[in-house]
Amino acid sequence: MTGDEALIDLEAVTRVYATGEVEVRALDGVSLRIASGEFVAVMGPSGSGKSTLMNILGCLDRPTGGRYMLAGREVSRLRKGELADVRSRTLGFVFQNFNLLPRTSALENVELPLMYQGVRARERHTRASEALDRVGLAPRSGHHPNQLSGGQQQRVAIARALVTRPRVILADEPTGNLDSRTSLEVMALFQELGGQGITIILVTHEPEVAQFASRVVVVKDGRVRSDERRAPRIVDLDALGAPGNDAAPAGGPS
């Protein structure tokens, strides 16, 4: 990979936390380069530094030392307001617990990031509708989270991440609350998005999930211990059926 190909470029990144007189090196000289369209799984035991790494990649935290280049821009020394702008325009986030507003429809949940950007109502509606269609949930755009299954809620969360047209999606244990079939549907969607040029960075502790990525980075004691590219397992969509067909919760609309 050449420098021109690297969408993400970490060089000797450290993150040190001070607790009284004790210093904890959560990251210790991490160097990592990721290209557009790569699907990367980040693995490691509890306390390994993988969450700190994701926070820095997501511009939620700044490194103590080293350099972080994102889309050709050095973001490691940006101020909080500048980091927030990078997050809203370049990055999308997907979380284990979905983080949907319970009294708000799927469409309105997806519109939220655009509201923060000041996008006008008509364009918000159009882009949110397109994002829901992209994840196979256009027919359920008016449903509230409690009327959706776990898999459907996670697809709403992915649509919300996509609506700002990010170059990178950061997913933190996105299948942790899903059954095995629904987890496969989410992995299929991530593989599809990677094929469209969106970079996917996925934190997981499950090897069964990591096998769908084309690259697996293992972090331990704040360092990258291994970085392996391999042929990913491809989800058989025909065997799963069309997206959006998982059942709604009991009592919810079908």
Describe the function of each predicted region.
Residues 223-250:
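Conserved beta-strand-loop-alpha-helix hinge in the C-terminal portion
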Residues 5-224:
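ABC family nucleotide-binding domain
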